[in-house]
Swiss-Prot record:
Residues 89-128, 154-189, 246-258, 290-309, 378-394, 597-620 have a biased composition (Basic and acidic residues). Involved in mitochondrial migration along actin filaments. It is found in: Cytoplasm, Cytoskeleton, Actin patch. This is Altered inheritance of mitochondria protein 21. Residues 347-356, 364-377 have a biased composition (Polar residues).
């Protein structure tokens, strides 16, 4: 970590060196210029430093101060009372406030009674100023590395001694309360005007002269340009810092009696403005820089008015305490009431000088902010003792906290997917083949049941019946095979012994059985082939034929019909006894002509065939035979023959 350096204090001008007596040491310690508080945690620090005053919360609107009447509140200037007078109007204050403040400064330069009291006032607490200075140096050295909090913590250290001095002076107490309330409501510096103090004390001119001497130590017109350059460029502290501090204190007493010219006032005013601009570059908050710029613009136009008023009122040349006018207007532009006593006017002028001192000390603090312990000690010795640090508290006011900027939302960067690198050796054909292998095979469609059965019929191999082959028992040599062949030629198949079976007969029987079984199995297979005739295409199922037409049976009748009937009939009867037998026999043998004609003629055959019944013919034959019997009654035995021909 780089250690920042503190810029060296600018050298004194020639005019100041000539007027400084080297032998006369400074009789009284110079007052400490109070530092202007920063706006981060100012209210909290002041409440912790002084246990007597509780923290005052912020209020949305400005209210009346404690002990302030309505008439005093109405007499205050509107520009100082409203936020627009300080924030929105570019820091320009009315000329009446500036004239009144300059008049009070002129009145405060007049000698008053009570120089001894003013000399004792910085040491009200009774503490050793050297011890207080060591405490301040330790506090500044511990927090020098933290640039954002060093000023606020220095304020808290100085506020610890504030409470003891406030107990001694009641009028300072009331003013601190009123200024803290105004700062809480405004957020920026506001001014309390016309505050009446019951127990007002006259401030001696010696204290004011001490404050003037602090400002006189600044360079004059001869060193105006080198001061601005050296304030910006940081340099290492010189070894003669202690000697310069002694010479500075000796020169204070001589400068108190030495008046300043109007030209010196203008040059010192310009130097103060340059310092204010350099302070903003080094370490001020944006709000402090804005206030200093606004006040500088408002005060440049009113420089001639200030000088004329000071010369008229004081009757002498203006002193160095009036160089804090640009900051004096910023801190408090007090317009006293017409009926105020001179004691109150002196008090208000004292407060204006203190406010200018506070701003001047703040510039020194901001320049010495990043210093370390070793580099900080020679420059802090140049400041006055810490006895008057409680005076800083009256002008310190809380400031706005510094809000850090919100970090931008960073969009996460998503890395791109790496491209798949194909090796040079692999050709595009091999890549395509590898992709083709990885692809799953296409699934075949499910076939219908008829198509599947049709394919199975062709795929099944035909069963060819093969004759059973009996394995040969053992391996025979060539000699044995030749001997067996010769034996078969001689003996044939061998001689069958009783109880032996002929193997050839057994083989023949087995083959016959297999052929028979194959024929039996083949016959039912042929029948379905015959029955599997090509069927006709069926029509729509809605139009069905009747069963009588569906179940038609075609009968093939033969051309000839066979009929069975009895052709001959023989009857036996007992013959009658007659004497003449021979004559009857001859008559019986005679053939009737009708019978002969019926046999010869084919027409008769046709008629008989057409008539199904033959009972009538039999009757006719019987009648004829009976007639013949009557004729042949004389015969012993009557033999009647009937011949019936049935034609088909």
């Amino acid at each position: 970590m780089d250690i920042p350096r503190i810029p060296q204090r600018p050298k004194r001008s020639k005019s100041s060196e000539e007027n400084t007596p080297s032998s006369t040491p400074s009789s009284t310690p110079a007052p400490i210029v109070p530092a202007r508080p920063r706006k981060n945690n100012g209210a909290a620090a002041s409440s912790e430093g002084s246990g007597e005053f509780p923290p005052i919360p912020r209020r949305p609107q400005r209210k009346k101060n404690i002990g302030e009447t309505d008439s005093e509140a109405d007499e205050k200037p509107k520009d100082a009372e409203s936020d627009e007078g300080w924030n929105d109007s570019e820091g320009k204050t009315p000329e009446k406030d500036i004239h009144a403040a300059l008049k009070e400064n002129a009145d405060s330069d007049k000698p008053d009674i009570g120089d001894s009291e003013a000399e004792k006032q910085p040491e009200v607490d009774g503490k050793d100023p050297a011890l207080n200075l060591e405490k301040a140096l330790e506090a500044n050295s511990e927090e020098a590395a933290i640039p954002s909090e060093d000023v606020t913590e220095d304020v808290t250290k100085s506020e610890e001694t504030k409470s003891e001095d406030i107990e001694a002076s009641v009028h300072i107490e009331e003013k601190v309360e009123r200024e803290s309330e105004v700062a809480d409501t405004k957020g920026d510096i506001e001014v309390d005007d016309g505050i009446e103090v019951d127990d007002a004390k006259e401030v001696p001119i010696s204290e004011l002269s001490e404050t003037d001497s602090a400002f006189k130590s600044e360079p004059t017109d001869d060193a105006a340009n080198p001061v601005s350059e050296e304030a910006v460029k940081p340099t290492e502290p010189s070894e003669d810092a202690e000697d310069e501090l002694v010479l500075d204190r000796e020169s204070k007493t001589a400068r108190e009696s030495e008046p300043l010219e109007a030209e010196d006032v203008e040059e010192q005013h310009d130097q103060a403005m340059e310092k204010a601009s350099s302070v903003t570059q080094i370490g001020e908050t944006p709000s402090d820089a804005k206030i200093s710029e606004d006040t500088s613009e408002s005060n440049k136009g009113d420089e001639d008015v200030k000088e004329n008023v000071l010369l008229e009122e004081s009757g002498s040349e203006p002193k160095d305490s009036e160089t804090g006018s640009p900051f004096q207007v910023e801190e408090s532009a007090i317009v006293p009431s017409e009926g105020k006593p001179p004691a109150e006017v002196a008090e208000t002028s004292q407060t204006t000088n203190k406010s200018a001192e506070s701003l001047h000390s703040e510039e020194n603090l901001t320049q010495a902010k990043p210093a370390t312990v070793s580099d900080q000690q020679p420059t802090e010795k140049q400041e006055p003792s810490e006895q008057e640090i409680p005076k800083q508290e009256s002008s310190k006011q809380p400031s706005k906290p510094i809000v850090p900027t919100r970090p931008n939302k960073s969009v996460p960067s998503v890395p791109k997917r790496p491209v798949r690198s194909v090796p040079a050796s692999s050709s595009p054909e091999s890549v395509q083949e590898s992709d083709a292998k990885k692809a799953p095979p296409p699934k075949p469609k499910k076939l219908s049941s008829k198509i599947a059965a049709f394919q199975q019929m062709f795929n099944q191999p035909e069963a060819v019946p093969t004759a059973p082959q009996h394995p040969k028992s053992g391996k025979l040599s060539s000699e044995k095979i030749g001997f067996a062949a010769n034996l078969q030629n001689v003996m044939g198949r061998g001689i069958a012994l009783p109880g032996m079976a002929n193997p050839q007969m057994f083989q023949r029987a087995s083959t016959d059985l297999e052929e028979e079984t194959a024929d039996v199995h083949a016959e039912p297979e042929q029948n379905p082939q015959v029955s599997k005739a090509p069927q006709r295409a069926r029509g729509p199922r809605g139009k069905r034929l009747p069963k009588a037409i569906k179940e038609t049976t075609v009968k093939v009748e033969p051309r000839f019909q066979l009929r069975v009937a009895s052709l001959w009939q023989v009857e036996f009867n007992k013959p009658k006894e007659t004497e003449k037998v021979d004559d009857d026999l001859e008559e019986d043998y005679e053939v009737e002509p009708e019978f002969v004609d019926s046999v010869r003629e084919p027409e008769s055959d046709k008629e008989t065939v057409a008539e199904p019944e033959t009972s009538t013919k039999d009757d006719s034959v019987q009648t004829e035979s009976l007639s013949n019997e009557e004729s042949t009654s004389e015969l012993p035995e009557a033999i009647t023959t009937e011949h019936v021909l049935d034609s088909p």
